[in-house]
From Swiss-Prot:
It comes from Haemophilus influenzae (strain PittEE). ATP binds at I23, R24, G65, K68, T69, T70, E131, D132, Y133, R174, Y184, R221. This is Holliday junction branch migration complex subunit RuvB. DNA binds at R294, R313, R318. The keyword Magnesium does not apply. Residues 258-335 are annotated as: Head domain (RuvB-H). The RuvA-RuvB-RuvC complex processes Holliday junction (HJ) DNA during genetic recombination and DNA repair, while the RuvA-RuvB complex plays an important role in the rescue of blocked DNA replication forks via replication fork reversal (RFR). RuvA specifically binds to HJ cruciform DNA, conferring on it an open structure. The RuvB hexamer acts as an ATP-dependent pump, pulling dsDNA into and through the RuvAB complex. RuvB forms 2 homohexamers on either side of HJ DNA bound by 1 or 2 RuvA tetramers; 4 subunits per hexamer contact DNA at a time. Its EC number is 3.6.4.-. It is an enzyme of class 3 (hydrolase). Has 3 domains, the large (RuvB-L) and small ATPase (RuvB-S) domains and the C-terminal head (RuvB-H) domain. The head domain binds DNA, while the ATPase domains jointly bind ATP, ADP or are empty depending on the state of the subunit in the translocation cycle. During a single DNA translocation step the structure of each domain remains the same, but their relative positions change.
Length: 335
């Protein structure tokens, strides 16, 4: 199964961008969850505005779907500046980045998603731009080539990544602010679902919002996606009213259980229990057993399972916890 095909995937789907923009909070006051990040960014932004400076360069990292792009846009809105958006894989040539940098206005935000995928050549262009607001450009070719420096306006680079450990040290060290986004609580997700329902003019019971939230794997993007599918079900089966029973029926139809697991999650945990006696099992063996790439397990499946206490990562391998056995209604054998 391709990760992007899963309804509980934290990765963005192509057709979601327009709807996501419609329900995305614009200001910190509307931003739900991440209290420490919200408080810190409020201080940093206000201080930069008081000094009439550009905000320090900001690195945002965390699992997919937690709001990195949303936070980048909020920074630009709070600073009252423009935001230009690109991604690491798109920036193939130094000239591509140079064109974006030279078109920035003072204090503008340049947002680079998947910044860990920048090529070394692009990073070399970024270093002086981030540190000195200067751009080194080579003019000509061969022996006649020469380097000229262009001054850039003070700007804020906001980088987003799901793999902060993959950033090179020179790039990571140039970010003055580093924020990690954590999985959201069910309470915060319930508020997010209720807010999104309001933006979409949906008739949603509070308990129905809770049902969607608790199956959303701590991830706002998943919560909003499930809400849209529950809306479809309610439109067809209940005149558009999303009651708690309708929400439960819709989510059951979508094969999302009470813990927010889909077939792939259950397949992974079942493999650890049934094929490897609960573990420990090495990542390569586990990947082979369920027919998935090890990167998919490590980057997509494991973070939530570990964070929720269903899977334990040890030096010897992955181990199913007692919570996993209880979820499947099984008795854990004594060691």
């Amino acid at each position: 199964m391709i990760e992007a095909d899963r309804i509980i995937s934290g990765q963005a789907k192509v057709d979601e961008d327009v709807i996501d923009r419609a329900i995305r909070p614009k200001l910190l006051a509307d931003y739900v969850g991440q209290p420490q990040v919200r408080e810190q960014m409020d201080i940093f932004i206000k201080a930069a505005k008081l000094r009439q400076d550009a905000l320090d360069h900001l690195l945002i990292f965390g699992p997919p779907g937690l709001g990195k792009t949303t936070l980048a846009n909020i920074v630009a809105n709070e600073m009252g500046v423009n935001i230009r958006t690109t991604s690491g894989p798109v920036l193939e040539k130094a000239g591509d980045l140079a064109a974006m940098l030279t078109n920035l206005e003072p204090h503008d935000v340049l947002f680079i998603d998947e910044i860990h995928r920048l090529s070394p050549a692009i990073e070399e262009v970024l270093y002086p731009a981030m540190e000195d607001y200067q751009l080194d450009i080579m003019i000509g070719e061969g022996p006649a080539a020469r380097s000229i420096k262009l001054d850039l306006p003070p700007f804020t680079l906001v980088g987003a990544t799901t793999r902060a450990g993959s950033l090179t040290s020179p790039l990571r060290d140039r970010f003055g602010i580093v924020q990690r986004l954590e999985f959201y609580s069910v309470e915060d997700l319930t508020s997010i679902v209720a807010r999104s329902a309001g933006c979409l003019n949906l008739e949603l019971e509070q308990q129905a919002a809770f049902e969607v939230a608790r199956r959303s794997r701590g991830t706002p993007r998943i919560a909003n996606r499930l809400l849209r599918r529950v809306r479809d079900y309610a439109d067809v089966r209940n005149g558009g009213v999303i009651s708690v029973d309708v929400a439960k029926q819709a989510l059951s139809m979508l094969d999302v259980d009470d813990a927010g697991f889909d077939y792939l999650d259950r397949k992974l945990l079942s493999a650890v229990i049934e094929r490897f006696d609960g573990g420990p099992v090495g990542l390569d063996n586990l990947a082979a057993a369920i027919g998935e790439e090890r990167d998919t397990i490590e980057d997509v499946l494991e973070p939530y399972l570990i964070q929720q206490g269903f899977l334990q990562r040890t030096p010897r391998g992955r181990i199913a916890t007692s919570k996993t056995y209880r979820h499947f209604g099984l008795q854990k054998l004594s060691d």
